[in-house]
């Protein structure tokens, strides 16, 4: 049995001048045990102007949150620059390369996925999801964005709710943060 602690779903959207990020609360040990149902995987950074959410190993994600916040401070809140610098450090550092997590970071102007392979990806349609239920949340979010007048916050919540109904590694203890 794989005893790493992981699995989650994070969804982010920008719409009509608003930005929202949602994450579920489940932490799973391996593939059989729910360790925690109320984890907070979406955080406000840089005086509340940036949202960050993680999927993957909890301990690794805390390391990345800390490093990303340091980069935000270093580059005066420039999200893109901080994300690129984090990705370069993550990919280039032997110890950091071992970290098993992905991040979504966003402000009111941008959404980015940052990975340990050095990638920084900006979605074409102002919404993105990562984690075990990411594809389910992304599908729901795209449909809701195209065919409803829901707010960014409501789409984020509903997308996570759909993912929680399909993915066993995602629960419906959903936290939504909005900018």
UniProtKB/Swiss-Prot annotation:
Record field: catalytic activity: ATP-dependent cleavage of peptide bonds with broad specificity
EC number: 3.4.25.2
Top-level lineage group: Bacteria
InterPro entries membership: ATP-dep_Prtase_HsIV_su (IPR022281), Ntn_hydrolases_N (IPR029055), Proteasome_sua/b (IPR001353), Proteasome_suB-type (IPR023333)
Main location: cytoplasm
Catalytic residues (positions): 8
Biological process terms in GO annotation: proteolysis involved in protein catabolic process
Leading EC class: hydrolase
UniProt GO cellular component terms: HslUV protease complex; proteasome core complex
Alphabetized Gene3D superfamilies for the sequence: Glutamine Phosphoribosylpyrophosphate, subunit 1, domain 1
Role: Protease subunit of a proteasome-like degradation complex believed to be a general protein degrading machinery.
UniProt subunit comment: A double ring-shaped homohexamer of HslV is capped on each side by a ring-shaped HslU homohexamer. The assembly of the HslU/HslV complex is dependent on binding of ATP.
Protein name (record): ATP-dependent protease subunit HslV
Species annotation: Staphylococcus carnosus (strain TM300)
Gene that this polypeptide is encoded by: hslV
């Amino acid at each position: 049995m794989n005893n790493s602690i992981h699995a989650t779903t994070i969804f982010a959207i920008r719409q009509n001048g608003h930005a929202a990020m949602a994450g579920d609360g489940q932490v799973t040990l391996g593939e059989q045990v729910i360790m925690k149902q109320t984890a907070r995987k979406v955080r406000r950074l840089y005086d509340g102007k940036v949202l960050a959410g993680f999927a993957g190993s909890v301990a690794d994600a805390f390391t990345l949150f800390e490093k990303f916040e340091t980069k935000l401070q270093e580059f005066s809140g420039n999200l893109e620059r901080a994300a690129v610098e984090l990705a370069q450090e993550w990919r280039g550092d032997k110890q950091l390369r071992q970290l098993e997590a992905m991040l979504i970071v966003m402000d009111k102007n941008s959404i980015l996925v940052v990975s340990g392979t050095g990638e920084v990806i900006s979605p074409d349609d102002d919404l993105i999801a990562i984690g075990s239920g990411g594809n389910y949340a992304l599908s729901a979010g795209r449909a809701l964005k195209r065919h409803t007048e829901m707010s960014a916050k409501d789409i984020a919540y509903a997308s996570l709710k759909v993912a929680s109904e399909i993915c066993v590694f995602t629960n419906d203890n959903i936290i939504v943060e909005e900018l």
